[in-house]
Amino acid sequence: MSASPTAGQAGLSYRDAGVDIDAGDALVDRIKPFAKRTMREGVMAGIGGFGALFELSKKFQEPVLVSGTDGVGTKLKLAFQLNRHDTVGQDLVAMSVNDILVQGAEPLFFLDYFACGKLDVDTAATVIQGIARGCELAGCALIGGETAEMPSMYPDGEYDLAGFAVGAVEKKKIIDGSTITPGDVVLGLASSGAHSNGYSLVRKIIEVARPDLNADFHGQRLQDAIMAPTRIYVKPLLSLIETLPVKGMAHITGGGLTENVPRVLAQDVTAVLKRDAWTLPPLFQWLQAQGRVADDEMHRVFNCGIGMVVIVAKEDAERAIRHLQAAGEAVWQIGEIRERAEGEAQTIVV
């Protein structure tokens, strides 16, 4: 007995169920040139296969793989609201590659996951173009990914992102903060904005303050300042690591300054950060004023203008600053390491 449709009856298709295979194929064709620009030594097979292949370089003697995964958080809600999808791809890459960088790892390759209810090829291609741009900045290959069209799972016009980065570091060169001692210097590298953290509070402030997001804000639109892509620190910091001993690094993400710096400190030391060592950028001044946010809350939610912290010996501080400035980074000496008193927090902003 045949299960085929009888004469005059149209059978159901995947498109009837809400999944457009042709749109998915069109997206793959659109993004292949973006991915191709990210290819690097080691890539054996990339987009299109069941699995991507990567061969570790012979320059590594005792390689340790370092992996990281992250998303963009509720910054995506603003992307939907503003219908701008050109920055969140770089955000996605930055969140993972900056994380694995702090252990001294060179990012090797990246994979992305794009999930939606109905696939809009133009939107998805714009996002993935941003992902490829982030991979170029980080020097890693966009080696594969997944586009999941799942009807009824997401509202029309919305999507979610996840990213996965894998890097490698020589075992003897892993940076874990174990050599940090009192007297060491804390350097802060400038952020490009709020990066990809604290956006639930950003959105709440926008909801309460109801600003004109197209209004001029220090020479750009307010929405441009809010949606600025996360800075990728990979190339300048890998160069610094080859130049002088870096004792520890902290990517300032969710938890702000006061909760991320302790992640690289031993229990017997404290980082004392001086708030007057750098100027709070205009975006954070605006957020604090419009939301009447307390200083302590700012420091544990936002990066407050410092996207990456680097800890070096006092005698290496000036050389590190000069090296990073020559690489195009804005950097300040923002604090020092001291012995931790009993019951004292591991990061203090004074």
From Swiss-Prot:
InterPro entries noted in UniProt: PurM-like_C_dom, PurM-like_C_sf, PurM-like_N, PurM-like_N_sf, PurM_cligase
Superkingdom to which the source organism belongs: Bacteria
Reaction(s) catalysed by this chain's protein: 2-formamido-N(1)-(5-O-phospho-beta-D-ribosyl)acetamidine + ATP = 5-amino-1-(5-phospho-beta-D-ribosyl)imidazole + ADP + phosphate + H(+)
Does the record carry Nucleotide-binding as a key word? yes
Is-annotated flag, keyword Phosphoprotein? no
Pathway assignment reads: Purine metabolism; IMP biosynthesis via de novo pathway; 5-amino-1-(5-phospho-D-ribosyl)imidazole from N(2)-formyl-N(1)-(5-phospho-D-ribosyl)glycinamide: step 2/2
One Pfam family recorded for the sequence: AIRS_C
Q: Where in the cell is it found?
A: Cytoplasm
Gene Ontology CC terms, in alphabetical order: cytosol
- Which Gene Ontology MF annotations are present? ATP binding; phosphoribosylamine-glycine ligase activity; phosphoribosylformylglycinamidine cyclo-ligase activity
Question: What keywords tag this UniProt record?
Answer: ATP-binding, Cytoplasm, Ligase, Nucleotide-binding, Purine biosynthesis
BP-aspect Gene Ontology terms: 'de novo' IMP biosynthetic process; adenine biosynthetic process
Q: What is its main location?
A: cytoplasm
Quote the EC number.
6.3.3.1
| Similarity section | Belongs to the AIR synthase family.
Question: HAMAP family, alphabetically?
Answer: AIRS
What protein name is recorded for this chain? Phosphoribosylformylglycinamidine cyclo-ligase
Q: Give the organism the record lists.
A: Cupriavidus necator (strain ATCC 17699 / DSM 428 / KCTC 22496 / NCIMB 10442 / H16 / Stanier 337)
**Gene responsible for this protein:** purM
